[in-house]
Amino acid sequence: MLSHPATSSVPAMTLADFTNPSLMIPHLRGQDAASVIQELSRILQREKRIPDLLPFYHAALNREYMVSTDMEAGMAFPHARLPGLKELSFALGRSDEPLAWGSKTPRSVRLVFLMAVPATDATQYLPLISGLARLGRDSRLVNRLQAATDSSQMLVALQQVELRTSAKPDLMT
């Protein structure tokens, strides 16, 4: 497990604390950034993590076209920061085949983390980004996520990355 020395008795948060199995798609249907962001936005709306599909989808897509969030580890981190979002959360999609991601210099991506970020909350956003970056540097966990065939396998891999923060969200409901 990627962890840090404990500084309090609060249980350690992991990447899994910001999502749940109903926010994961182990076999994405989308073939490009726009369709994958739409697919993941739909489950964020279905699970009531975002109030309206179109404003969130357009904000995430516009942000992605301005600056691509792809990483060498085969992951992308599109996101939108909007007012009215109640909690920081993300949807995770896994593509069976690599997707060309990025408008200027496309990279192959198989894992897409679409983050819904409240406009007023930067306190939990930074530890989440840091945890996702650490995940990208752990090839063993990236490989586990890329090989996952269901949401429970994806969740187990995310539980291996601990975050530095003291507030724990309750997204498993």
Predicted segments, located by residue:
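Cytosolic covalent-transfer regions centered on His/Cys nucleophiles
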Residues: 1-173
